[in-house]
Amino acid sequence: MNSIWARLRLASSQLPIGGYSYSQGLEAALDNGWVRDAESARTWLVDQLQLNLARFEAPLLAGLLRAALIGDWAACDAASERHRASRETRELAQESRQMGFSLHQLLEALPELDAPGRAWLARQDPPNLAAAWAMAARAWRLDAEEALSAWFWSWLENQLAVLMKTLPLGQLAAQKLASSLLPELDRACAEALRRPAVEGSAAFGLALASMTHETQYSRLFRS
């Protein structure tokens, strides 16, 4: 089967894992005035890509994806635990748990994931999103680059949806922003595949946005 179908499926906004309930700190950045228009939104997103996702989140996920594809369960355990420990706020931890749980439930209901993958995922109590994403890649026969590019696209599409609802950003403006960000997305994905996973990150702006969001007076999103 052509792997493009599985990649589109994994990246799709129709994947029922609740991703569009979360803004990953962007709603708080808007409320605090750090993001005010399309230009400042682009700066925020490029910083996230270059300073956080490409250097920490995505290399960690790439390692987990590679381990999952070959069935190196000890390496999967280590990467999953590192991902769990790296969530800097309660909101971000709950987001990863809820989305991981929902993706686990989906994989349990579908036939593609093999017995070793199901057994490992069942031992994660509950699985975080990175763990479940890696098992989805195993189930749907995606290599690390394919599954990671789906993850990056899902992230970007989510952030654009947040901007359209809260800035607000029009659909055409959102597509123009997407066009300007696609080269950055490509570079971030390539860098993440080259980098080894590291022990931790220091995304202070994201952590502060997430913490202030927990006490924000009015909000649309859960993070």
From Swiss-Prot:
> Where in the cell is the protein located?
Cytoplasm
Q: Which domain of life is it from?
A: Bacteria
Any Pfam family: UreF
Annotated keywords: Chaperone, Cytoplasm, Nickel insertion
A GO MF annotation of the entry reads: nickel cation binding
Instruction: Tell me if Cell membrane is a UniProt keyword of this record.
Output: no
Could you state one GO cellular component term attached to this entry? cytoplasm
Entry coiled-coil feature ranges? none
The subunit structure is: UreD, UreF and UreG form a complex that acts as a GTP-hydrolysis-dependent molecular chaperone, activating the urease apoprotein by helping to assemble the nickel containing metallocenter of UreC. The UreE protein probably delivers the nickel.
Function in brief: Required for maturation of urease via the functional incorporation of the urease nickel metallocenter.
PANTHER family attached here? UREASE ACCESSORY PROTEIN F (PTHR33620:SF1)
Could you say which protein family the record assigns here? Answer: Belongs to the UreF family.
Record protein name field: Urease accessory protein UreF
Species of provenance? Pseudomonas aeruginosa (strain ATCC 15692 / DSM 22644 / CIP 104116 / JCM 14847 / LMG 12228 / 1C / PRS 101 / PAO1)
